[in-house]
């Protein structure tokens, strides 16, 4: 018995090596704090807290995020649902109802242009 045909298995092609970035993920202030050194005031200049407005904002952001903690979920849920002008009530359990089946919903051309509320 002889083998006929072509194999359906193909060897994987060699992958091209891509140099990974130096850091993966969000940068945190402690990771780059040693790179940015605060400007030292000269003898003739009065010492100010922060001369760079971007660095001043960074300092404010650090203090604000450290004291508040995570935002409440109820606030984030409100932002997730944009108001469309047609505010429907929640279901009888207080939970949101599932969206209607698109096959059952009539388009304005098919129906008499009634509100779905």
Swiss-Prot record:
It comes from the Eukaryota. Residues 103-117 have a biased composition (Basic and acidic residues). Coiled coil: none annotated. Residues 1-117 are annotated as: Disordered. Disulfide bonds: none annotated. Residues 32-45, 87-96 have a biased composition (Acidic residues). Belongs to the GAGE family. This gene belongs to a multigene family expressed in a large variety of tumors whereas in normal tissues, expression is restricted to germ cells. These genes organized in clustered repeats, have a high degree of predicted sequence identity, but differ by scattered single nucleotide substitution. Their sequences contain either the antigenic peptide YYWPRPRRY or YRPRPRRY which is recognized by cytotoxic T-cells. This is G antigen 12H.
């Amino acid at each position: 018995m002889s083998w006929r045909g072509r194999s359906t298995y193909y060897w994987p092609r060699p992958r091209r090596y891509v140099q990974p970035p130096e850091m993966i993920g969000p940068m945190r202030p402690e990771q780059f704090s040693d790179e940015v050194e605060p400007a030292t005031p000269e003898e003739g200049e009065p010492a100010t807290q922060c001369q760079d407005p971007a660095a001043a904002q960074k300092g404010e952001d650090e203090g604000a995020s450290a004291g508040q903690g995570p935002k409440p979920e109820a606030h984030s849920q409100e932002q997730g649902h944009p108001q469309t002008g047609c505010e429907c009530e929640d279901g009888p359990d207080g939970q949101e109802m599932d969206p209607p089946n698109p096959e059952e919903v009539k388009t304005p051309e098919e129906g008499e242009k009634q509100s779905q509320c």
